[in-house]
Amino acid sequence: MKWNQKNLPIVLASRSPARIELLNRIKIIPSHIIKADIDETPNLRELPAPLAVRLAYAKAIKVVSQIEESAIIIAADTVVAVGRRILPKATTYEEVKNCIKILSGRRHRVYTGLCIIKKENDRLTVRQKIAQTIVKFKKLSDEEINFYCSLDEGIDKAGGCKISGYAEAFIAFISGSYSNVMGLPLFETVNTLTSLGFKVYH
């Protein structure tokens, strides 16, 4: 992508392949990709949507502190919840299995907090959004659960599942943004970038 002279370079505060792919879909290629290592532990009684917003902001600010040049920093955090119960970012086979069992046959909500910061001449302009998608999985058999867990694609994923992978076959119902479930709501991303003066359609 050729940058318009009026466009600042994009810095993505994530190494998520899904988020990189989603930006590429709207013809945005980040000039830098920086993983923001932060503590993602929910606060006591913290609700899913505020958690997603807080973590996205923390990621963006962390990356802002690491760069000197003017840029637009995009950060996001995805949280999966059943009611008020926040499911973990699964790190083991057992965590994936527990998450999938909870999601089986139930509606759940996927929240992605989006924080985009325009850093220009040491001035910061912060925009924050939250996107929500309702997803319902069909009732899964033990065989289906065990097979999915054996794929390892739920490792390091919020709620222990990768919607753009095999788990897509489990979706009985979805209401809302599919890109949000993948980790970056494109509608909100484009609108926010535009509000900051970034020419998305150039």
Curated annotation (Swiss-Prot):
Gene3D superfamilies, alphabetized: 3.90.950.10
Transmembrane segments: none
The protein's enzyme class: hydrolase
Protein's UniProt keywords contain Transferase: no
Reaction equations catalysed: a ribonucleoside 5'-triphosphate + H2O = a ribonucleoside 5'-phosphate + diphosphate + H(+); a 2'-deoxyribonucleoside 5'-triphosphate + H2O = a 2'-deoxyribonucleoside 5'-phosphate + diphosphate + H(+)
GO biological process: nucleotide metabolic process
GO cellular component: cytoplasm
Cofactor: a divalent metal cation
InterPro entries in the record: ITPase-like_fam, Maf-like
Any one GO molecular function term: nucleoside triphosphate diphosphatase activity
EC number in record: 3.6.1.9
Hydrolase keyword on record: yes
Compartments (UniProt record): Cytoplasm
Alphabetical list of PANTHER family matching this protein: BIFUNCTIONAL DTTP/UTP PYROPHOSPHATASE/METHYLTRANSFERASE PROTEIN-RELATED, BIFUNCTIONAL DTTP_UTP PYROPHOSPHATASE_METHYLTRANSFERASE PROTEIN-RELATED
Reported function: Nucleoside triphosphate pyrophosphatase. May have a dual role in cell division arrest and in preventing the incorporation of modified nucleotides into cellular nucleic acids.
Family: Belongs to the Maf family.
Designated name of the protein: Nucleoside triphosphate pyrophosphatase
Upper taxonomic lineage: Bacteria, Pseudomonadati, Pseudomonadota, Alphaproteobacteria, Rickettsiales
